[in-house]
């Protein structure tokens, strides 16, 4: 729904010409729910923990945004500014006013070019994202999210250019490059002093079938003597979904090498995984491995049932530790209207850590329920 007057009020610090744009739209999503998690460390000293809390964005990230466009001759120029926030207690989710997206784009007969802060091609954030092709749980739903089934980063990048081609009988090509992944870090853009990123994706959609292939390449910064010759990271993911009317089936397989972290979402499974926060450490503790997942959605009882299973096998490139993870999840959504739906879900994740000194098999059970409202 277009809310031009309210959008103009929120944009009071912008140029007056923006107020008159008839296509400026204010939009948003609020997802608030309850979550119970049982975590078992299996380290011989840590007791199992049970947590019950109110949470934001369990199945749809809470956000608000402004978007608009203007037709200029044969091209369309537009923008998207999107803020993420925690609906359970109010603060910004990414310590930035427009942390989810801040971009401008130009669209014409030769495709669309985006510039600014965008979601990666492999993510589910932004108009160019392809992540929704591979899993019915997207990157959310706790441990069910596909980000914990791969070894790549499903986040966002600053200082980026993203190109999306026109559709050729259902076939689209996407290309993306970031001159500097994180604009808050020091270092000159497009230099070896900063992390950079490149990706190429191909998608195909024809009737009930949709498929995707993405390859991405992470160029780690080389500012420390110990890691100046560290290999860059890359990953490949291929998969898709097919609608059989009674059920839509999803599947994907992926491979990664020298990637920075193994993402773990719910239950504290990252407590034993050697995740790191700096690129220098990322290089030394990069991971190699593969993952696979299967999922499905089906109409039931007036709503939609969502189910999935997955497996990921990873090892340190320059170490001895290995991590084998599998997950299973079941969810349900019920729409009261086009704008409001309720959800419930249960997830189970187990990761066997085969380490030099000892082995661990921690696990987590998550139960969630909540309400999503869109405006």
Task: Give short role names for the model-derived ranges.
Residues 74-77, 110-114, 170-173, 208-213, ...:
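Repeated loop/turn-to-beta-strand initiation elements of outer-membrane beta-barrel proteins
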Residues 362-375:
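Outer-membrane beta-barrel "beta-signal"
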Residues 21-36, 51-182, 194, 203-210:
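Outer membrane beta-barrel
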Residues 193, 199-329:
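Detector for outer-membrane/organellar transmembrane beta-barrel domains
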Residues 1-23:
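Gram-negative bacterial Sec-dependent N-terminal signal peptides
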Residues 30-36, 79-83, 117, 175-177, ...:
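Transmembrane beta-barrel strands of outer-membrane/channel proteins
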Residues 4, 48-62, 97-100, 155-159, ...:
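Residues that define the transmembrane beta-barrel architecture of outer-membrane proteins
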Residues 12, 68-70, 106-108, 165-166, ...:
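Residue-level signature of outer-membrane beta-barrel architecture
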């Amino acid at each position: 729904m277009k809310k031009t007057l309210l959008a103009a009020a929120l944009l009071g610090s912008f140029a007056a010409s923006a107020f008159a744009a008839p296509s400026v739209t204010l939009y948003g999503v609020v997802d608030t729910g309850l979550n119970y998690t049982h975590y078992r460390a299996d380290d011989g000293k840590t007791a199992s923990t049970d947590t019950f809390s109110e949470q934001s964005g369990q199945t749809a990230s809470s956000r608000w945004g402004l978007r608009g466009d203007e037709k200029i001759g044969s091209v369309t120029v537009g923008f998207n500014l999107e803020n993420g926030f925690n609906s359970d207690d109010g603060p910004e989710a990414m310590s930035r006013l427009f942390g989810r997206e801040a971009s401008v784009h130009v669209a014409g007969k030769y495709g669309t070019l985006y510039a600014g802060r965008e979601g990666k091609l492999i993510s589910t954030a932004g108009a160019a994202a392809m992540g929704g092709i591979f899993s019915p749980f997207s990157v959310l739903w706790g441990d069910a999210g596909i980000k914990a089934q791969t070894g790549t980063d499903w986040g966002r990048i600053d200082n980026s250019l993203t190109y999306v081609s026109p559709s050729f009988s259902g076939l689209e090509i996407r290309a993306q490059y970031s001159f500097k992944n994180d604009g808050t870090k020091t270092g000159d853009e497009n230099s070896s002093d900063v992390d950079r990123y490149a990706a190429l994706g191909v998608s195909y959609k024809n009737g009930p079938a949709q498929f995707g292939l993405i390859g991405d390449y992470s160029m780690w910064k080389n500012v420390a003597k110990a890691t100046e010759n560290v290999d860059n990271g890359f990953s490949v993911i291929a998969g898709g979904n097919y609608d059989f009317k009674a059920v839509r089936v999803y599947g994907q397989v992926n491979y990664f090498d020298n990637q920075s972290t193994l993402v773990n979402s719910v239950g504290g499974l990252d407590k034993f995984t050697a995740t790191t926060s700096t690129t220098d450490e990322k290089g030394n503790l990069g991971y190699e491995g593969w993952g696979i997942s299967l999922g499905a959605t089906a109409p039931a009882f007036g709503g939609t049932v969502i189910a999935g299973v997955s497996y990921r096998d990873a090892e340190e490139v320059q170490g001895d530790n290995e991590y084998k993870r599998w997950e299973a999840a079941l969810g349900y959504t019920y729409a009261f209207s086009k704008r409001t739906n309720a959800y419930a879900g249960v997830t189970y994740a187990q990761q066997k850590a085969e380490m030099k000194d000892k082995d661990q098999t921690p696990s987590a059970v998550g139960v969630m329920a909540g309400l999503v409202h869109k405006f």
